[in-house]
Regions:
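Conserved SAM-binding strand-loop segment of SAM-dependent methyltransferases
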Residues: 251-260, 495-504
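A short glycine-rich, Lys/Arg-flanked "PGG" loop and its adjoining helix->strand segment in the class I
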Residues: 267, 286-301, 512, 529-547, ...
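C-terminal interaction modules of eukaryotic adaptor/scaffold proteins
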Residues: 464, 474, 490-493, 499, ...
Length: 608
């Protein structure tokens, strides 16, 4: 879809470069520029003068631009206690707003975003002694202690080989609560249990997307990567253990989330395998609603790996009771046991609706209503029902997906659900291959082979940007803005991962998470929604690592506006701006701005 053309200039305007004649006009221009600069200062220091003030790039264009020589030189820095702030997962905010949350339903781990007057319009500082992260692939096994100063987990899990503190570094031997001898050996055993060729869990490319719930420090996901399996490692925000923060610092695909009351922000039929290794989730609560949510996101014939003492319940009466109830629930959901060995059981989901149709009338859990959209997943409550397959899936007896990596570039079967042709899909691939090649050419002198590991495409469309990075040693979090959430199913069908999000709110990740952010027409979209561009820039700064890069492709007016703020954001370590080649997805008004964030020290900034 082509972007909207830029708005016309105001009546009587001579454009941004129009000169002024006469003393009164010069004075008026200077006064307008000073007033605008003062308004920006009020915005960013935003407490007393105008806490909800938000300027839009189009408003700046319609009134008066910042004079060529004027740019905002600084932004306030948040207090050091906010160095790990996640605004929408802030426990302190719960108390300030007096939220009445049901802890038994894990509502305190779900998103609760601050209202506009309570947002911190300041830059999140790094912790004392912060260092540029160790590069992949070394980061899989070691990170700087100073970057995540939380060693409680190392002592608590010392007997399970999760992590070990060695002076200024934290090492990850690859252990876990259920796999003391290493995740790699555990993964081989799972493949053997399922009888997969060559003892490889990828099953010749047919297992690609995995959901790991309660993932610890994501060592399971880390050791799946050599098999060309990508896991969405999921765990709640824990102020004491910071498991996901360690995973992201290691460069392992992971995100903050919880099985609570709302659906996971993923479409139906996204994963070939879900994994729970002593994940401490009560799967039996509320009529099995949490297990039914896993069922929703599993593909036809998908596997659920459950490694827990309850699966080996011969001697413990409590475990025997749980195992009996769990087995009964799985059977009523039409799951069958594919393999069981020791403390691990693997269930498999049916390929068709046949078993569902053969259940007794009024059997529980019920089938979901016909008008339920299984792909609706942004702020949607979970439902204790089974999602049936469409007529097409039921007839095909499966997801109709090619093995990895062929599925990356082949038109996915669900394209027709969002009204996109195979031809347009292929053209989209070609366009993004060309765009990414141009971006890397622009950055060539400034980056090295492993400069990027954690990458986010903030407006992912069909996943073309991520697909073009396939031969680079990176992983990409593809974000589908909630207005276009239907496209996320295409991204998953390509063997990529991602999430739904509303960029008017903060993202659910720790500060200093991503090496590269890509924002294509995102600022224009936020402007259309009436959301503050400055809020988005500050959020990008929060999640971008020092020495990280951002690629912003948008209207010229937006790019010019952002450039004025680079010094204040400390994004002026290096930058490049070009007018890109015209293609079927672009307009003549687009520009590309690539910037690099500085590594700055809070104490030094305060002293200067």
């Amino acid at each position: 879809m082509k972007p909207h053309p830029p708005p016309p200039p105001p009546p009587g305007s001579r454009g941004w470069g129009a000169g002024a004649t006469g003393r009164r006009r010069a004075f008026a221009c200077a006064l307008a520029g000073a007033a605008l600069a003062f308004a920006l200062l009020c915005l960013f220091h935003g407490a007393a003068f105008g806490p909800t003030l938000r300027l839009r790039a189009s408003q700046v264009q319609a009134q008066a631009p910042l004079p060529d020589g004027l740019a905002l030189s600084s932004l306030p820095v948040c207090d050091a206690r906010h160095s790990e702030l996640i605004p929408c997962l802030d426990r302190g905010l719960h108390h300030q707003l007096r939220l009445r949350l049901n802890l038994s339903l894990m509502e305190h781990y779900e998103r609760h975003c601050p209202p506009a007057p309570r947002r911190l319009n300041c830059l999140i500082p790094p912790p004392d002694g912060y260092l540029v992260p160790i590069r992949w692939p070394r980061s899989r096994d070691e990170v700087w202690t100073a970057n995540i100063p939380h060693t409680h987990l190392a002592s608590e899990k010392s007997d399970q080989r999760w992590m070990v503190v060695n002076g200024d570094k934290i090492n990850f031997p690859g252990g876990g609560t259920h796999f003391h001898h290493g995740a790699d050996k555990y993964i081989v055993n799972l493949a053997q249990m399922l009888g997969f060729p060559n003892d490889k869990l990828n099953n010749e490319g047919n297992i690609r997307n995995v959901l790991d719930v309660g993932c610890g420090v994501a060592s399971f996901g880390a050791y799946l990567l050599p098999l060309d399996i990508i896991a969405m490692s999921l765990a709640p925000n824990d102020v004491h253990e910071n498991q996901i923060q360690f995973a992201l610092e290691r460069g392992i695909p992971s995100t903050l989330g919880v099985l609570g009351t709302r659906r996971l922000p993923y479409p139906s039929r996204s994963f070939e395998l879900a994994h729970c290794s002593r994940c401490r989730i009560d799967w039996l609560q509320r009529d099995g609603i949490l297990l039914l949510e896993v069922d929703r996101v599993l593909r036809p014939g998908g596997y659920f790996v459950y490694s827990s003492p309850e699966a080996y319940a011969h001697h413990d009466p409590a475990n025997r009771k749980i195992w009996k109830q769990m087995s009964n629930l799985a059977q009523r959901m039409c799951w069958r046991i594919a393999s069981k060995e020791g403390q691990t059981v693997i269930w498999v989901k049916p390929l068709t609706n046949g078993c569902y149709m053969r259940r007794e009338p009024r059997a529980l859990p019920p089938m979901c209503a016909h008008d339920d959209d299984p792909d609706a997943a942004w702020n949607v409550l979970m439902k204790a029902c089974i999602t049936p397959y469409s007529k097409r899936v039921n007839k095909a007896k499966g997801a109709e997906l090619l093995p990895w990596p062929q599925r990356l570039t082949a038109p996915p079967p669900r394209l027709e659900e969002i009204g996109i042709s195979s031809k347009n899909f292929s053209e989209d691939n070609e366009i993004w291959n060309s765009r990414v090649a141009q971006y890397w050419k622009l950055m060539k002198s400034e980056i090295q082979k492993y400069s990027f590991r954690n990458v986010m495409d903030m407006n992912a469309n069909l996943g073309g940007f991520a697909a073009s990075l396939r031969k680079k040693d990176v992983w990409v979090m593809n974000v589908a803005p909630f207005m276009e959430s239907g496209k996320l199913k295409i991204i998953y069908d390509r063997g990529l991962i991602g999430t739904i999000h509303d960029w008017c709110e903060s993202f659910s990740t720790y500060p200093r998470t991503y090496d590269l952010l890509h924002a294509w027409l995102l600022f224009s979209e936020m402007e259309n929604q009436g959301c503050g561009l400055e809020d988005l820039l500050i959020e990008m700064d929060r999640i971008m690592r020092p020495h990280g890069h951002a690629i912003i492709r948008d209207k010229a007016a937006v790019i010019d506006y952002i450039k004025k703020l680079l010094p204040a954001l400390r994004w002026d370590d290096w930058s490049s701006e070009v007018k890109p080649k015209r293609d079927a997805l672009s307009s003549d008004d687009e520009r590309v701005l690539i910037v690099r964030k500085k590594l700055w020290d809070q104490a030094a900034q305060a002293a200067s």
